[in-house]
Amino acid sequence: MTDVATQTADILINGIPFSEFIKNNTIESDISDWDFLKDNSDTERDTDGDNDNENENESNNVDVCTNISPSLSEQDVQGLRESILYCIDESVRNNPLSFSDPTFHIKLENSIYEVIEYTFSDNSFTSIDIFAFTEEMENQIEEVITTCLEEYFETIVPPRSYPTTCILQPPNVAETVKKIEYLKSIPQDEQRTAGWYIFRNKLITASAAWKVFKSESCINQLIYEKCKPLAANITANSDDVDDIEREKDKEQIIVEKTFVNTNSPLHWGQKYEKLSVMLYEARNNTKVGEFGCIKHPKYDFLGASPDGINVDPVSPLYGRMLEIKNVFNREITGIPIEEYWIQTQLQMQVCDCDECDFLETCFKEYEDEAAFIHDSSSDIDAEFHLTSAKTLKGVIAYFMKDGKPFYEYAPLYLTREEYDRWCEEIIDKNAGITWLKNIYWYLNQYSCVLIRKNDIWFESAIKKIENVWNTILKERETGYEHRAPKKRTPKKKNNIPYEENTNESGCLIVISDLELNI
């Protein structure tokens, strides 16, 4: 049978710890009805009360095992199935927040096996143990458990995620049109603009809400970030300055303070986000629309900025949300990590989307154009866009505009002739700004999995989020300084004159810490 070594101590059933449940609420109530446990041993046991002979006891045990049916009858299977479905449902509904755990399904399955093992090894209510099962019976039990889990997560509650993206059913076009039109009608600032930062500061956003479900330290950090002023040097008092004017002051300061470290993982993700959208649209023959920061229609302290939503009415993906993560150095497993799973769930709730494609991409960059051109699958011009490993490659033109990075993305699947022409045309198109270089990329990994909206999880999660938000509102008035991170004593640095320190690295062009704090 499946290894049950995975810890299940954090699972509750009927509101009590799992370890207590399997002692007091196992499936023993159904055991008397299962034919494969009827060993007829009552007629074979010593009725004279003389059970001191060890050989007789061993003989009885052998008789019990030999009288076990070699397989489960249909009645046995049905009884087992009903009990397992009950255990699954109780576990899920008593542990809804556990869905965010990437090992959720493994823990749940192992807990079911543990119930079975404990039930049939407890001699207080059955005369056999699990090790007396035949191989055929073990296979039957394993098949029943697997089938029950599949049926439950197909019909009752959606699984945490699917192994890949897929179409479960065609979209309701009429209903989806109304949803998208409503989202478009909501006033919203473009992502990463000053107004966008200001609006997000008034909310707990989907991308930061994961901290609510982590340690006290993470919760403390979130409260501190939301309490402190958006820009440190804004000191305007609400009694002295009109609200609208104060918002304008904030916006101006934000614009002035927005610096972008082009070497950071954050900027890497932003740089390749549009390219990931292009790939997704091309692979799925769809169109992705952009949206700003949107507030939940009921819970006004919760907001989300989805990377996009499929807006092509003829696409089978119409209305499906898209969340993108451009991996810098993390392994892509196809299983969304906890922080990202929570983010997608909250985004779907805010935008009333039932499904989300969670896309992870990993791009690598060539050293120069020569390496880019050399890495080709063949000399055929039509395959110029393919690497020697048959993966996609392309080019991004990197400009500087108003002191900030600006990128132009070459169309996908270019021939060599089209590539040469695009490189010339893009320079002419942006003649008024500074061209820095071309970035030559290739696709190293592409993973897209489907995540469905989980209302059971959200019903429990929103209560915890609201509690933290109430604390934020309170401490904005009463004081939050006690939550400030403790300052570490800086290490002693060498006293090297600035003129002589010529080994500084990195390109700090123009991002403040605002995005990381919101």
Please describe what each predicted stretch is.
Residues 1-518:
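Accessory terminal regions of nucleic-acid processing enzymes
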